[in-house]
């Protein structure tokens, strides 16, 4: 009989409702190395103390419910309950708090992102006592992360497979994203790869529609890959989107890609689901396929600052579930992403050990031990004038992906690819020579234009294109 059971038997069961903070707010608690730690941005309803709100989050995402129950006496709540162990006000905001919650490791199934999220964020976000709730960060202990395979291959293995080192990889999303026949789609893939790109990509919503069934697309893209490889002497790839309506169909598509001998497949991990993604990642490791991950639907979850879940949490979850690439914003393009915040979760994707750094939005020190890293993909509204900034921001271990910035070239797809490859090589050379990419960006690109008419034409087309909007989700700073 557990100590708690003995206590219950001694004093008798007392029915009723009691404040969550009496059981789940424990500021004296010292976190364990094996705890999963969570940082929640809590906005309580008027009249709800922050301690009660934080305790409610801990309770409703672990062992608690709205009233006392008889069966509490049949287990040890002290062993299994979540604990709100610290609360702090959010800088520059009124009635917002960061509530830190510790969860015992035994609450979670090994190797299951699905179970982890079902517990931590599955129910509590609809709790009436909270006006809004956002999961800002998680600390995944090595004791839990080691139960996951993680990325199928990781950064170093991918570079070895491709035999490409010392620079970012270049990609292109085929446009228009919907409506092309499989043959015309394959033609665009070939032209881009022949022009100097490393990868081309299915858009996230290209699955198997009436205008282009998946098997036809796979065959024409494989033909384009082999033809471009033969002409350039470089290893090429196309992200064949295996996302489907069922897990069984998804695996059939991945198997077809393997039989065609292509190097990489793709999955929409949020719309497809973490269970499907983990299954696909395991298949990819066992069969030598790289796995590109698109984050379609992420902004529904992560864009609002006071409610939902920050992308750094989704990025950590993806690294655990498995993926070799994931879209991570651009900072300079058309999609949301503040620089320091973006660099924070880029490091969480790539590095083995990341120190706590609130200036970049990192709430906890994260040790991935030996889990392979994930290449961040910069994609969305970028073109050749952005190349110096992208090279400086993301470094070598990244994929820079230009869709309209390749296919929108006035001379065609292959010249668009040439322009991007020349711009990238010029930026890498300038950086290696010690030049300041941020300060000399325009000069570096203009110098390269002298040797590449394709780049000069691209620069002329996109010289006035900028996306200068303030990001919605920004780091917390004190307001004057």
UniProtKB/Swiss-Prot annotation:
The disulfide bond which can form in the large chain dimeric partners within the hexadecamer appears to be associated with oxidative stress and protein turnover. GO terms for biological process: photorespiration; reductive pentose-phosphate cycle. Mg(2+) binds at residues 201, 203-204. Belongs to the RuBisCO large chain family. Type I subfamily. Heterohexadecamer of 8 large chains and 8 small chains; disulfide-linked. The disulfide link is formed within the large subunit homodimers. Coiled coil: none annotated. The record marks 334 as: Transition state stabilizer. It comes from the Eukaryota. It is found in: Plastid, Chloroplast. The gene is rbcL. It catalyses: 2 (2R)-3-phosphoglycerate + 2 H(+) = D-ribulose 1,5-bisphosphate + CO2 + H2O; D-ribulose 1,5-bisphosphate + O2 = 2-phosphoglycolate + (2R)-3-phosphoglycerate + 2 H(+). Binds 1 Mg(2+) ion per subunit. The active site is at 175 (proton acceptor), 294 (proton acceptor). Substrate binds at residues 123, 173, 177, 295, 327, 379. The basic functional RuBisCO is composed of a large chain homodimer in a 'head-to-tail' conformation. In form I RuBisCO this homodimer is arranged in a barrel-like tetramer with the small subunits forming a tetrameric 'cap' on each end of the 'barrel'. Its EC number is 4.1.1.39. GO terms for cellular component: chloroplast. RuBisCO catalyzes two reactions: the carboxylation of D-ribulose 1,5-bisphosphate, the primary event in carbon dioxide fixation, as well as the oxidative fragmentation of the pentose substrate in the photorespiration process. Both reactions occur simultaneously and in competition at the same active site. HAMAP family: RuBisCO_L_type1. The modification N6-carboxylysine is found at residue 201. Residues 1-2 form a propeptide. The modification N-acetylproline is found at residue 3. This is Ribulose bisphosphate carboxylase large chain. GO terms for molecular function: magnesium ion binding; monooxygenase activity; ribulose-bisphosphate carboxylase activity. Its cofactor is Mg(2+). Signal peptide: none annotated. The modification N6,N6,N6-trimethyllysine is found at residue 14.
